[in-house]
Amino acid sequence: MTTQVPPSALLPLNPEQLARLQAATTDLTPTQLAWVSGYFWGVLNQQPAALAATPAPAAEMPGITIISASQTGNARRVAEALRDDLLAAKLNVKLVNAGDYKFKQIASEKLLIVVTSTQGEGEPPEEAVALHKFLFSKKAPKLENTAFAVFSLGDSSYEFFCQSGKDFDSKLAELGGERLLDRVDADVEYQAAASEWRARVVDALKSRAPVAAPSQSVATGAVNEIHTSPYSKDAPLVASLSVNQKITGRNSEKDVRHIEIDLGDSGLRYQPGDALGVWYQNDPALVKELVELLWLKGDEPVTVEGKTLPLNEALQWHFELTVNTANIVENYATLTRSETLLPLVGDKAKLQHYAATTPIVDMVRFSPAQLDAEALINLLRPLTPRLYSIASSQAEVENEVHVTVGVVRYDVEGRARAGGASSFLADRVEEEGEVRVFIEHNDNFRLPANPETPVIMIGPGTGIAPFRAFMQQRAADEAPGKNWLFFGNPHFTEDFLYQVEWQRYVKDGVLTRIDLAWSRDQKEKVYVQDKLREQGAELWRWINDGAHIYVCGDANRMAKDVEQALLEVIAEFGGMDIEAADEFLSELRVERRYQRDVY
């Protein structure tokens, strides 16, 4: 199958102009980027940039505030599209990241729109945690003069589907806010629901907010979105895989790969803290197994996004086969009248458990049925790209991007199963083979602007990836700030990822301290949170010296355990109770001194 990438000729800038723009903006702060956006708008309209960046007086019109709370970029894209719709309707709108929002201003909001995703076990995105805590605290103000709407993005394969949006919606109403529209909960395939919701929001707001004068129809407080590139999630770069190296030992229970991808002369840029989006193909053997279990041939024509494709091709390129969901189980049970699965229908907990423990192909194996090709396609979810924390800095690797991939492998009744994207990169892409990629920028996981600022990095397992990028950048910048790494894994001899590199950084004085937790090398299990408590006094000194704290890895257990350890350290060595420690950590988050990249 040939992947079509938009030719550069379609861009309004030639390659040289695009390169100059990228070079000029790559190290600007979000605030500076927002100002530059207003400046260019002012130049275009022959008005001073200051006017373009100044909100209209509140007395003249009630402004609309859109809060974007995004984890992987989808919520941000919906918020940006809504902002553009409202500007087209000549309404005065302000778009802001939840992490930049001064939440004490919420009492003065008249028209408030929240677009949010959900992470972990129903938690809000990292950039919205402080706002979420504030609204659920005793400090939250009454909002009787606020009308609001919430669009919630989620993944129905998780138990706490769209929980963050549900939280914001219920709390805003509880505080006295008036719902402009009922909340919308959108699944992975959110685009159609988002488009319909945006149109309804515009219609609802037209009757609430007077039309702005031309000079006032400008987005203020812009979300961090100015990343100039012809490549995106919907138009990925076709790059080539240059290195696929296993970096765990022969006897390790884990298969972790160091992957290097050659970006060629694409000009694709990224920063430490960003993620690499990977569009993968399903395993042809898995496709064949599923098709045969359903008594199909694979050459049946099916319709995908208005195009007719053979079933095998559609399944390999366009549909999710490695993640089951409660909805899929329920729909399959209803379609096939399976005696095994029908008793689960209506019991959310049992459906979730079955979906989490039984891949789609094994669900079909255990409850065989005959479906036609279109029925199968309608049962499945669209394939979505996987995001991997980038493990390199272009200050060192230039036109490459590195990722650290934990390959998902397991057995179901003796049959080997694997994760879709991780096995694609590890097993099915040959050297110099094509990989479709894009950069998902993450402005909520950034090194300090001041190179003298100390950095504390906590990243067990593959959570170490962005800190490799951080250290490459700090070394290239000759940053004088101290660096401290906490890393953990089961065994020292088998699972010390990038061991030689960390040892070199210590020897060269770039890595000031390193604390290692090997959970299976002794009778008593030791994790990174235990090392945090053990080093509590020194950790508190670093925090008092202005250190930034970064956490990367598992959201469900590790991140919570690490946060609890940090709270205990702050309470003990800061001489405060847990409630005060929680306030202290929340302040660090607001100040961007406590940042997490968890999944």
Swiss-Prot record:
GO annotation, biological process: cysteine biosynthetic process; hydrogen sulfide biosynthetic process; sulfate assimilation
Annotated pathway: Sulfur metabolism; hydrogen sulfide biosynthesis; hydrogen sulfide from sulfite (NADPH route): step 1/1
Protein name per its UniProtKB record: Sulfite reductase [NADPH] flavoprotein alpha-component
Organism (species): Shigella boydii serotype 4 (strain Sb227)
GO annotations of cellular component type: cytosol
Residue numbers binding NADP(+): 519-520, 525-529, 561
Enzyme class: oxidoreductase
Primary role: Component of the sulfite reductase complex that catalyzes the 6-electron reduction of sulfite to sulfide. This is one of several activities required for the biosynthesis of L-cysteine from sulfate. The flavoprotein component catalyzes the electron flow from NADPH -> FAD -> FMN to the hemoprotein component.
Chain residues that bind FAD: 322, 356, 386-389, 404-406, 410, 419-422, 599
Residues bound to FMN: 70-75, 117-120, 153-162
Domain FAD-binding FR-type: 234-448
Cofactor binding comment, as recorded: Binds 1 FAD per subunit.
Cofactor(s) recorded in Swiss-Prot or TrEMBL: FAD; FMN
Reaction catalysed by this enzyme: hydrogen sulfide + 3 NADP(+) + 3 H2O = sulfite + 3 NADPH + 4 H(+)
EC number: 1.8.1.2
Top-level division of the source organism's lineage: Bacteria
